[in-house]
Structures are given as structure tokens and as C-alpha cells.
Curated annotation (Swiss-Prot):
It comes from Schizosaccharomyces pombe (strain 972 / ATCC 24843) (Fission yeast). Its main location: mitochondrion. Residues 1-37 form a transit peptide. It comes from the Eukaryota. Keywords: Mitochondrion, Ribonucleoprotein, Ribosomal protein, Transit peptide. One of its GO terms (biological process) is translation. The gene is mrps12. It holds the Pfam family Ribosom_S12_S23. One of its GO terms (molecular function) is structural constituent of ribosome. Belongs to the universal ribosomal protein uS12 family. One of its GO terms (cellular component) is ribosome. CDD domains: Ribosomal_S12 (cd03368). Component of the mitochondrial ribosome (mitoribosome), a dedicated translation machinery responsible for the synthesis of mitochondrial genome-encoded proteins, including at least some of the essential transmembrane subunits of the mitochondrial respiratory chain. The mitoribosomes are attached to the mitochondrial inner membrane and translation products are cotranslationally integrated into the membrane. uS12m is required for respiratory growth. This is Small ribosomal subunit protein uS12m.
Length: 162
């Protein structure tokens, strides 16, 4: 005798084992053939597949950690209240064809129109619409000059020991 408790670890089967009540409105009217239900083995074999969760923060990267793009415009924006600054950003046409706005981190940059850049996810929190960061020290964007601390974030090589 099979008990309901044995199928507790299979959520699909446990749902099938529960008694169901079918109202007359759910039954197919004027149907000559009966409704085909799945057998227990078919239910085990074809388990419900849950869709993979996608990262909704960086949609334009299309699942990649980085994307290459070409700068179409380099400009500055002012951040939201209460912050006050002039943030350097670039409008970038990605290799996928999308056009996004990316933040250029660090002090000073050599980004110009038609410069090839590498983008990563990660938004500038106080700039609306800026959802991506330019990776410094890759392609046409140089690393931050004179940077000693946090060099890996700004694309700077280790200085030569004198």
C-alpha cells in the first residue's frame, strides 16, 4: 500500500495525490473523448521546469559579464539631490546594437567619441539612467594616472619599486 507521506518529497506527485473536486463547469461539455490525465510515472519523469532568473539590473549585457562598445557621446551629468558634482558619463553603442549610458570612474579620463570601451554592470546610484560602468585600463580608455590605492578598480599597473 502506497502512503501519501512517501510522496511528500515530490511536490508534483503530492499535488496529484490530493483529492480534487471538479465542478460541472470545468468538465468539457459535449465531448466524446475523456480527458487524458498524466500517470504517476509520467509526472515523475517530466518534472516542472522553473525558468531561470535573469539579472534585471544589467539587461543590455545579455547575460555576459562584460560587453564591448563604441562611445557615441562623452558628456557630464549632475547627480540627484542631495549630492552635488559633475559626473563623467558616456553614451555607448554596444556590440549587440543597443545604446546605453555608462559612468566613467576615477579622476580624469581620455574618452572621446569613437573610442572603444569595455562595459560592466553596476549603476551610478545618484545618476538616473546610468546603469553601467566603463572598465578603465582596457581598449582605448587608459587607467587613472597617479593612482596608488585600489588600483585594480581603476586599471592601474603596479608601480615599479625604486
Amino acid at each position: 500500500m502506497i502512503r501519501f507521506a512517501q510522496y511528500a518529497r515530490y511536490p508534483v506527485i503530492s499535488r496529484l495525490m490530493k483529492p480534487t473536486v471538479i465542478s460541472p463547469f470545468q468538465a468539457q461539455a459535449f465531448s466524446s473523448s475523456s480527458v487524458m490525465l498524466k500517470t504517476l510515472n509520467q509526472t515523475i519523469r517530466n518534472k516542472e521546469k522553473r525558468p531561470e532568473k535573469t539579472n534585471k539590473q544589467s539587461v543590455a549585457l545579455e547575460g555576459s559579464p562584460f560587453r564591448r562598445g563604441v562611445c557615441t557621446r562623452v558628456f557630464t551629468v549632475k547627480p540627484k539631490k542631495p549630492n552635488s558634482a559633475v559626473r563623467k558619463v558616456a553614451r555607448v553603442r554596444l556590440s549587440t546594437g543597443r545604446s546605453v549610458t555608462a559612468y566613467i570612474p576615477g579622476i580624469g579620463h581620455n574618452a572621446q567619441e569613437h573610442a572603444v570601451v569595455l562595459l560592466r554592470g553596476g549603476r551610478a546610484q545618484d545618476c538616473p539612467g546610468v546603469q553601467y560602468h566603463v572598465v578603465r585600463g582596457v581598449y582605448d580608455i587608459a587607467g587613472v594616472a597617479g593612482r596608488v590605492t585600489s588600483r585594480s578598480k581603476y586599471g592601474v599597473k603596479k608601480p615599479k619599486a625604486a
